[in-house]
Amino acid sequence: MALTLADVDKIARLSRLHLTAEEKEKSLQELNDIFTMVEQMQTINTDGIEPMAHPHEAALRLREDEVTETDRAAEYQAGAPEVRNRLYIVPQVIEE
């Protein structure tokens, strides 16, 4: 499937892009190269090949679901000008 300049014009119009004649020619060549590559990929026999999310085997190193940090909220909030119910109180910046 090869695109024409009319196709590039339509794509540009739908995308609200303003392309010069030179940009249209370059886009036409690049898009046709992409379609050629896709057509080549479609000819590859993938029967018996399991689909995968990523080409690399990745083993996740999981740890036990245990708390590894202590609650330090009081320590963090000690320097705050005002705290109420573990929430930082800040001046109102948006009028109602």
Curated annotation (Swiss-Prot):
Keywords (A to Z) from UniProt: ATP-binding, Ligase, Nucleotide-binding, Protein biosynthesis
HAMAP family assigned to the protein according to its UniProt record, in alphabetical order: GatC
Reactions the enzyme catalyzes: L-glutamyl-tRNA(Gln) + L-glutamine + ATP + H2O = L-glutaminyl-tRNA(Gln) + L-glutamate + ADP + phosphate + H(+); L-aspartyl-tRNA(Asn) + L-glutamine + ATP + H2O = L-asparaginyl-tRNA(Asn) + L-glutamate + ADP + phosphate + 2 H(+)
Alphabetical list of NCBIfam families matching this protein: gatC (TIGR00135)
EC id: 6.3.5.-
Gene3D superfamilies hit by this protein: Glu-tRNAGln amidotransferase C subunit, N-terminal domain
Function, as annotated: Allows the formation of correctly charged Asn-tRNA(Asn) or Gln-tRNA(Gln) through the transamidation of misacylated Asp-tRNA(Asn) or Glu-tRNA(Gln) in organisms which lack either or both of asparaginyl-tRNA or glutaminyl-tRNA synthetases. The reaction takes place in the presence of glutamine and ATP through an activated phospho-Asp-tRNA(Asn) or phospho-Glu-tRNA(Gln).
Subunit details: Heterotrimer of A, B and C subunits.
Keyword Transmembrane helix set for record: no
Superkingdom assignment: Bacteria
Single GO term (MF): glutaminyl-tRNA synthase (glutamine-hydrolyzing) activity
Gene Ontology BP terms: glutaminyl-tRNAGln biosynthesis via transamidation; regulation of translational fidelity; translation
EC class: ligase
Organism: Neisseria meningitidis serogroup B (strain ATCC BAA-335 / MC58)
Protein name (Swiss-Prot/TrEMBL): Glutamyl-tRNA(Gln) amidotransferase subunit C
Biological classification of the source: Bacteria, Pseudomonadati, Pseudomonadota, Betaproteobacteria, Neisseriales
InterPro entries: Asp/Glu-ADT_sf_sub_c (IPR036113), GatC (IPR003837)
Keyword Protein biosynthesis in record: yes
Family that this chain belongs to: Belongs to the GatC family.
The gene coding this protein: gatC
